[in-house]
Amino acid sequence: MPSEGEQRWVVAIMAKAPRAGGVKTRLCPPLTVAEAADLYRAFLLDKIEQVRSLEAASHGIAHTPDDARAIFAELAPDFILIPQRGGDLGRRLVATFAHFFAGGYTGVLLVDSDTPSLPTEFLLQALDVIAKPGTDLVLGPSEDGGYYLVGLRAARPELFEGVPWSTSGVLPETTRRARDLGLGVAWLPRWFDVDTGPDLERLRDSLAATAGPLPRHTRRFLDGRPG
């Protein structure tokens, strides 16, 4: 936990337990439910490695369901682990931000677990801009109208309550609320989630065109499953 007066940051992954039938069901078909769970586990492992590489921040996972703690303790034994609290995604985001701010962190960045090809540079940029005076909110927009990252310098529950989650209206509504609250907003580059069959093919194509081993767990899964 940060000492009094010390500026500290935390990057936490919003994650689900990689259980068959509970994750990535929109990828079935082309995947089976077991394959979808294995793919999501690969996404998680890659995101954990990516977040762990951020030396300027503490690292956490907000997990669901509550009984999944042992799974995440095995996947990321060095991470802060907390259960997600609340009904919809908005309430869970509010509770997760509240938990970390209560722990004394200066800024909190929450990232999704559906963007295995997201460049680490984007997360480094988020840590840079959240530390700048005048930045209250950092958003990493997703192509589907949501966001892959949201960061705050103080709890702002009004940003998340009553938002039409899982629709293309999430980002516009969040932006409108931030403007109404007078918040200074910093933007990251747009990126894509992997939720559907076409998304998976796009991921496969983008990784095939990209040099380097990362994201290594996702690459291993895709290499073992011909397209």
Segments predicted by a language model, with ranges:
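N-terminal nucleotide-binding beta1-loop-alpha1 segment
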Residues: 1-26
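Conserved alpha/beta core of the MobA/IspD/sugar-nucleotide pyrophosphorylase nucleotidyltransferase superfamily
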Residues: 2, 173-227
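Short, glycine-/small-residue-rich phosphate/pyrophosphate-handling segment
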Residues: 157-175
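Short beta-strand/loop segment that forms part of the nucleotide-sugar
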Residues: 56-65
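Conserved donor-nucleotide/metal-binding helix-loop-beta segment in metal-dependent transferases, i.e.
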Residues: 118-144
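A short, N-terminal amphipathic alpha-helix
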Residues: 38-57
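Short phosphate-binding loop-to-helix
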Residues: 71-108, 167
